[in-house]
């Protein structure tokens, strides 16, 4: 097997913690607002998060994912609180606080829980410490305090808006209703649910059954999914996953684990394989191709990605997996 490359949540609360010193919430809110502005401008969340300071990234990633799941509701609330759309950095910070505020009360996805007044205080502090938002700090404070006073009435006022109800873009909701008239609500509801942490066993090193026995011996609850996958009952940091550092398993969504076997199923494995993975980072499917093809055929995989930073992850993952 050969490979050539070219450039190209544990829970949110635990992800937000630091091993050394507590990071003020206002700093995380600032960084989350910067990421949200980038996403609204067309960047992927992954690309935007790569620009976040390393010490802040785990907590900010948790906040970003949490906020995006509630962004439709937050934007609807902001429209009730402000007659005009504020400048992007201000709007991002306000919507983030609203998303965390209303979801804090519901707690419908096991997410973050902040005291509402602490959240307002830290959002205003974040605004004051950024020159781009400092002039609007009083505006943010007024909007958020009004939300606290009128929360029930405001939530009721936006309850009939599809984007507020489902936290998806309107075009997406309309398309799902058209394509899946009987199940569109179930699909949207599932999209708003935290995905379980899925692992893929490296069949060059361990079988699914063997790894499940390892987890059972360590009192880690898990269940098999598909031919190579394992769903953990509770997410955990990768360094705490047995065998992760030794390359026995990778973190990979169960759906993504279907790509490599589906491709190989349609190829003649009696012949040498030359495979192009044109969107390879961080290398999960590339590694899976090599793991499976290596047991059946000679495979040369060329892995490409447009992002040089993420392309480095391909090398790191392949080195770890061996």
What are these regions (language model features)?
Residues 1-322:
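S-adenosylmethionine
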């Amino acid at each position: 097997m050969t490979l050539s490359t070219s450039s190209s949540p544990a829970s949110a609360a635990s992800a937000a913690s630091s091993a050394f010193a507590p990071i003020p919430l206002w700093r995380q809110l600032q960084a989350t607002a910067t990421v949200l502005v980038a996403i609204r401008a067309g960047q992927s969340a992954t690309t935007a998060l790569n620009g976040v300071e390393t010490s802040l990234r785990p907590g900010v990633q948790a906040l970003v994912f949490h906020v995006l799941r509630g962004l439709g509701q937050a934007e609807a609330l902001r429209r009730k609180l402000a007659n005009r759309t504020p400048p992007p950095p201000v709007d991002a910070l306000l919507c983030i606080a609203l998303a965390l505020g209303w979801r804090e009360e519901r707690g419908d996805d096991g997410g973050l829980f902040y005291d509402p007044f602490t959240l307002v205080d830290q959002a205003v502090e974040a605004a004051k410490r950024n020159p781009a938002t400092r002039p609007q700090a009083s505006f943010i404070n007024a909007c958020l305090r009004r939300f606290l006073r009128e929360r029930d009435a405001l939530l009721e006022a936006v309850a009939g808006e599809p984007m507020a109800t489902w936290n998806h873009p309107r075009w997406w909701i309309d398309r799902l209703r058209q394509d899946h008239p009987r199940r569109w609500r179930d699909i949207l509801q599932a999209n708003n649910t935290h995905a379980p942490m899925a692992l893929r066993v490296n069949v060059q090193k361990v079988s699914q059954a063997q790894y499940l026995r390892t987890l059972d011996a360590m009192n880690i609850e898990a269940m098999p999914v598909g031919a190579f996958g394992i769903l953990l009952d509770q997410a955990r940091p990768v360094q705490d996953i047995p065998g992760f550092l030794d390359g026995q398993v990778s973190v990979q969504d169960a759906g993504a684990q279907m790509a490599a076997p589906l491709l190989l199923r349609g190829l003649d494995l009696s012949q040498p394989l030359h495979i192009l993975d044109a969107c390879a980072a961080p290398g999960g499917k590339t590694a899976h191709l090599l793991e499976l093809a290596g047991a059946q055929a000679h495979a040369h995989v060329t892995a490409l990605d447009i992002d040089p930073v993420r392309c480095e992850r391909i090398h790191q993952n392949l080195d770890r997996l061996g």
